[in-house]
Structure formats: structure tokens, C-alpha cells
């Protein structure tokens, strides 16, 4: 993200990452906070399902829902006493968070059921050197989800990046260095998989944005 900011506006990059200017913190739960908590809940529940050796698409709805509620309660308690419980609006946001996380994990299971990919890691943090000679840069980030599909000789890697807002991949922006996030994630993920699966060919399969939403279909009485 910081590299994309530099490509768009070097001054903005300097003010944000050089001078470390930040907006004044307010006692409120922002959309950014909402996305951070939602990501954390999805990661925690998916990790628990994997740790228990359960299937993402065979787990019962009741058990999945209970795991989501427990995770949301634990994570939102971090917001001291709690900013999320000081109004009816924020209480509604907690309920919405539960619904979105539950639907996302359910949808993930349905998608996995239709293919051969399986989740490899969630929320993978990485540090990676890029460049050559004296022109090297350290790139760091967090990949929401890495899936793999493997046989005796090859491992295919797929990147899933969760977004709470609308985000489309644009190859032109990637060319100009404005939208490189998924490409960097793939490079980092392939290095991770190569280390964990020595002796196998590691191949890129695809990079995808996953829009976290609870869509409502509009319809007239006639339709």
C-alpha cells in the first residue's frame, strides 16, 4: 500500500510514512476499525476450524455461528469497555459483523467444495527484499488467505484478499505501480510455499479480491 501511495503522490507518501502525520484519534468506531475486526474474526474462526481438523463446508451452521459470535465478543472487548457498546448503532454494527463473518465463512466453504484448492495459511505476515544490487527495498504486508492445490510434482498457489469496500483489479494501474498489492502478495506466497514444499514446482494459479458483503436483492411485486 505504501508503494502504491508513493506511485500516486510522493508528497503524500512522505507526509504519511516519513513525517508520520496522522488524523486526530476520535472516540468512534470507523469503517477502518470495522474492516480490521472483521478480518480478525474471519481469521480466528478459520484457524479454529482448521486446528480442529474440521471441514469448512461440512461444519454445522449452529457450530459455525457460535464460533463467530464467540470470536466477535472476544475481539470487540479489546475496544475498552467498550466503544462498540456505547450506543444502539454500534450494537447493531456488532450484529452486522457477526452476520458478515458468518456468511463469508459459509461462502468460503461452498467455494472450496466446488474445487480442489484448500486454505494453506490465513493472515500471513511477510517481509521480502525486492530489487538488485544497491537498489533493494524491503516490502512487508499481510496476506489475508493463501490457498494451494497440489499433486506429486506441482503446487498451485491462489491469493484471496478480503475487501469490505468495492475493489476491482486494474492491469493498467498495476503497470504504473498504483495497484501492485496482489502481485506482491503472490510473489511472497510463492516463496513461502516453496519453503514449505521443497522439491515441488510452485506455480501461480490466480489472485482474487473477495468482497465481504451481505447482498440484498431488490425486486418489485411483479418480479
Residue spans for each PLM region:
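C-terminal, charged and often intrinsically disordered regions of DNA end-processing helicases
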Residues: 1-44, 48
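Beta-sheet entry/capping signal
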Residues: 3, 10-12, 118-120, 144, ...
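Active-site-proximal structural scaffolding
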Residues: 7-8, 27-35, 61, 65, ...
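Active-site-adjacent bridging/hinge elements
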Residues: 7-19, 69-77, 153-164
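A non-catalytic, helix-rich entry segment at domain boundaries
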Residues: 40-125, 129-130
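Substrate-binding beta-hairpin/strand module that engages nucleic acids
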Residues: 54-59, 158, 186-223
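Non-catalytic protein-protein interaction segments used by genome-maintenance enzymes to assemble
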Residues: 119-194
Amino acid at each position: 500500500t505504501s508503494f502504491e501511495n508513493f506511485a500516486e503522490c510522493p508528497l503524500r507518501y512522505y507526509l504519511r510514512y516519513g513525517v508520520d502525520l496522522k488524523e486526530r484519534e476520535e472516540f468512534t468506531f470507523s469503517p477502518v476499525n470495522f474492516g480490521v475486526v472483521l478480518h480478525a474474526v474471519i481469521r480466528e474462526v478459520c484457524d479454529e476450524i482448521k486446528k480442529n481438523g474440521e471441514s469448512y463446508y461440512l461444519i454445522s451452521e449452529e457450530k459455525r455461528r457460535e464460533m463467530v459470535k464467540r470470536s466477535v465478543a472476544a475481539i470487540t472487548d479489546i475496544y475498552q469497555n467498550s466503544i462498540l457498546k456505547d450506543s444502539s448503532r454500534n450494537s447493531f454494527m456488532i450484529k452486522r459483523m457477526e452476520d458478515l463473518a458468518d456468511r463469508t465463512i459459509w461462502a468460503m466453504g461452498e467455494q472450496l467444495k466446488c474445487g480442489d484448492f484448500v486454505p494453506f495459511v490465513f493472515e500471513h505476515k511477510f517481509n521480502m527484499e525486492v530489487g538488485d544490487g544497491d537498489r533493494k527495498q524491503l516490502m512487508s504486508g499481510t496476506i489475508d488467505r493463501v490457498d494451494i492445490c497440489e499433486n506429486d510434482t506441482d503446487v498451485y498457489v491462489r491469493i484471496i484478499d478480503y475487501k469490505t469496500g468495492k475493489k476491482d483489479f486494474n492491469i493498467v494501474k498495476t503497470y504504473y505501480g498504483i495497484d501492485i498489492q496482489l502481485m506482491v502478495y503472490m510473489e511472497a506466497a510463492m516463496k513461502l510455499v516453496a519453503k514449505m514444499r521443497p522439491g515441488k514446482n510452485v506455480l501461480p494459479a490466480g489472485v482474487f479480491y473477495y468482497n465481504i458483503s451481505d447482498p440484498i436483492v431488490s425486486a418489485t411485486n411483479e418480479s
